[in-house]
Regions:
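Short basic helix-loop element that most often maps to the first helix and adjoining turn
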Residues: 4-23, 48
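Short, charged recognition helix plus adjacent turn
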Residues: 51, 61-68
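Recognition helix of helix-turn-helix/homeodomain-like DNA-binding domains
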Residues: 25-40
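DNA major-groove recognition helix of helix-turn-helix/homeodomain DNA-binding modules
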Residues: 25, 44-59
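Short, basic-rich loop-to-helix N-cap that marks the start of a DNA-contacting helix
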Residues: 38-48, 67
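A detector for short, charged/polar N-terminal pre-domain segments
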Residues: 1-4, 39
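Conserved functional loop/turn residues at catalytic and ligand-binding sites
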Residues: 14, 19, 35-38, 64
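Conserved hydrophobic/aromatic packing and binding residues within compact polymer-binding modules
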Residues: 6, 20-21, 31-34, 60
Length: 68
């Protein structure tokens, strides 16, 4: 699945794919696959990103427009 908000919040935070990959202890290439929707992102990564960005997982998934 492709969730453009994952990319959008990263760019809004002025972070690179490498920055976020390092946070998740994965390669930039692996993170890129998740961001483009070519691989399913594990829930543990999704929750880590939500916590890091201070938004809800539902927001990242596009299920709500409420940030928190």
């Amino acid at each position: 699945m492709y969730f453009p908000r994952i990319r959008d919040v990263r760019e809004d935070s002025d972070k690179t794919q490498k920055d976020i990959a390092d946070l998740l202890y994965i390669s930039q290439q692996q993170y890129s696959l998740y961001e483009r929707g070519e691989r399913e992102m594990p829930l543990s990564y999704l929750y880590a990103l939500a916590k890091f960005y201070g938004v809800s997982a539902d927001y990242l998934l596009g299920l709500t427009d409420r940030i928190t």
